Amino acid sequence: MTTKEAIADMALEAQEEDDAGPPDGGFRAWLVVLGGFLAYFVTFGMLNSFGTFQEYYGEKLLPGRSTSEISWIGSLQLFLLFIGGLFFGPVFDAKGSKVLFIPGTLLLSLSQMMVSLCKEYYQFILAQSLLFGIAVAMLFYPTISAISHWFHHRRGLAMGIVLTGSSLGGIAWPLILERLFAVVGFPWGLRIVGFISFALLAPACFMVIPRLPPRKSGGLSKADLSEGLKDRRYWLTVVGMLFVIWGMFIPFYYIPLFAMDHGVNSSFANSLISILNAGSFVGRIVSGALADKLGR
């Protein structure tokens, strides 16, 4: 870090000390929540709908591939999403949200257009796993970081509202995808989805804005990082999240195939993904509000 950057960070720290803190409301803060809702509707809504792709690929596009091989397409998406925090978190700290949100929006729409052209397994890995996974990471981390800038005492509620976007997306996308595949076919179905995604994410690029200015040095110092890594509460959270995430996405990937193996027709089996996502809608808001009241 240069002397100039150090001085800039010292000035920023002084500004933060004088700052009254997150407003916990107001037009600008709730606009960030709305932008996050739109982002999660597209990103996690689509991730939560992978079971639709899993079933369709096995039946139509990749019949020679095993269920395990096809599930790697979705699994790599999740890997890139979560590992992406190591790279995109510091970028947000140093540059703000737009430098991630705008290219992330373009990359996500591009990935869906590219998936519409895929015919071979490796092409799906490149377009749907690699491009889409990176794009989701570029949108995910600025959103959760910006929410913490604007909310403190009501952060759980705000994040719960944002997360309902993933529930509503998980309800809508399986039904939309199934209908589009039946009416216009897979290629044009994905292109239409790409246009819809862009239309929803474009305004979010200008809604999800941090309250605090970026740090020129790129976020935490080595001393801050070292102190955080020594905190037992941090490691308890990490271990807890490991077990939560470990099995969380399995139903979203496999419930249609499981249902069809037990005699359920393919259309209703696909609808089970929407039903599964609907079950999480109320819980996301209620659990967030309770976290604010009872402690996080």
Swiss-Prot record:
It is a multi-pass membrane protein. Disruption phenotype: Blocks the secretions of pyranterreones. Pfam families: MFS_1. Keywords: Cell membrane, Glycoprotein, Membrane, Transmembrane, Transmembrane helix, Transport. The chain crosses the membrane at residues 30-50, 72-92, 98-118, 124-144, 157-177, 180-200, 238-258, 271-291. Glycans are attached at residue 265. Coiled coil: none annotated. Gene3D superfamilies: MFS general substrate transporter like domains. MFS-type transporter; part of the gene cluster that mediates the biosynthesis of pyranterreones, a family of antioxidative compounds. Directly involved in the secretion of pyranterreones. PANTHER family: MONOCARBOXYLATE TRANSPORTER, RIBOFLAVIN TRANSPORTER MCH5. This is MFS-type transporter pytF. It comes from Aspergillus terreus (strain NIH 2624 / FGSC A1156). The lineage of its organism: Eukaryota, Fungi, Dikarya, Ascomycota, Pezizomycotina.
